[in-house]
């Protein structure tokens, strides 16, 4: 990893990335795509060491409290977060200023900060967003080798449910010929319903492949599933959207089950829920901080 002094932190949508790059090693990672123009190796994580100070300045400049969310490009709970505590320090400042917090992660390291999420949620609002991809433990360790499995993330969701902290799941990607089975999707959905998630984000039964991420994904397929990359090339050529042959049936299953259990399943509805601040905490007085 290497350290930088960032010039700014929050996007116009109040999103932030504390780290740039990732060491989780997910074989399908879209953030490896060349369009993102990384100037350093993806695993050489860039650390925005002044992020907590930038966040505090940005919050002090706002007249109203809002939800502060981490981006999906780089998980805020990198292994180095154990020592650096950037995410934790940002959460402490979010709590102090009465803002809301939403974090998207695949790591059970988020449990370290559950007390902070609890306090923020009691004062304003916090939402944990967690990615679930595959119910099979062995396959999960192949596809996402350096982070906890989806089954372990389910346990995290249950713990947040116990604290009555809202959760949203990203059910993506579903990999053609690997995880795009009815059995896998149904198991993941059952976990979501059992954990009381508010919404499930699913853009389709498939994944996206671009220059940079496609080559990395195919090399992983060649290592672990010989011949499968050839099947992808024959089926999809260089397509960006790579949908499962069972896409339509799986999406019908997804929407039907979510409707039955009263769970948000339109991505825009999920995003609106995440971004909405409770009316009683939307107005911020900095003199209370």
Annotated model-derived regions:
Residues 1-129, 133-141, 150-154:
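Conserved Radical SAM active-site core
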Residues 84-87, 118-130, 179-196, 221-224:
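Short, electropositive alpha-helical surface patch
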Residues 98-99, 165, 197:
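A structural motif
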Residues 68-69, 104, 167-171, 200-204:
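Short beta-strand segments at enzyme active-site cores
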Residues 1-5, 183-289:
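Auxiliary Fe-S-binding modules of radical SAM enzymes
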Residues 135-137, 144-146, 159-181, 204-207:
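Conserved strand-turn element in the central/C-terminal portion of the radical SAM core barrel
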Residues 47, 109-111, 176-179, 208:
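Acidic-and-aromatic substrate-binding clefts and catalytic sites of carbohydrate-active enzymes
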């Amino acid at each position: 990893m290497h350290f930088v002094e960032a010039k700014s932190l929050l996007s116009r949508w109040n999103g932030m990335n504390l780290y740039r790059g990732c060491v989780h090693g997910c074989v399908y990672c879209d953030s490896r795509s060349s369009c993102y123009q990384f100037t350093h190796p993806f695993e050489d994580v860039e650390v925005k060491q002044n992020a907590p100070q930038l966040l505090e300045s940005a919050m002090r400049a706002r007249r109203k409290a809002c939800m502060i969310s981490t981006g999906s490009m780089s998980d805020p709970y990198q292994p180095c977060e154990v020592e650096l505590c950037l995410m934790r320090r940002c959460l402490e400042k979010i709590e102090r200023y009465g803002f809301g917090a939403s974090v998207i992660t695949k790591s059970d390291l988020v449990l370290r900060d559950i007390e902070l999420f609890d306090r923020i949620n009691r004062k304003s609002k916090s939402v944990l967003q967690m990615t679930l991809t595959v119910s099979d433990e062995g396959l999960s360790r192949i596809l996402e080798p350096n982070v906890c499995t989806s089954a372990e993330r389910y346990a995290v969701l249950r713990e947040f449910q116990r604290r009555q902290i809202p959760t949203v799941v990203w059910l993506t990607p579903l990999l053609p010929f690997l995880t795009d089975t009815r059995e896998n999707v149904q198991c993941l959905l059952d976990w979501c319903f059992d954990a009381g998630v508010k919404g499930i984000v699913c853009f389709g039964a498939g994944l996206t492949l671009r220059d940079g991420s496609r080559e990395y994904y195919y090399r992983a397929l060649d290592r672990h599933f010989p011949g499968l990359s050839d099947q992808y090339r024959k089926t999809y050529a260089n397509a960006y959207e790579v949908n499962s042959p069972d896409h339509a049936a799986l999406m019908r299953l997804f929407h039907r089950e979510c409707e039955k259990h009263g769970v948000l399943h339109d991505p825009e509805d999920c995003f609106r829920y995440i971004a909405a601040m409770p009316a009683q905490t939307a107005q911020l007085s900095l003199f209370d901080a």
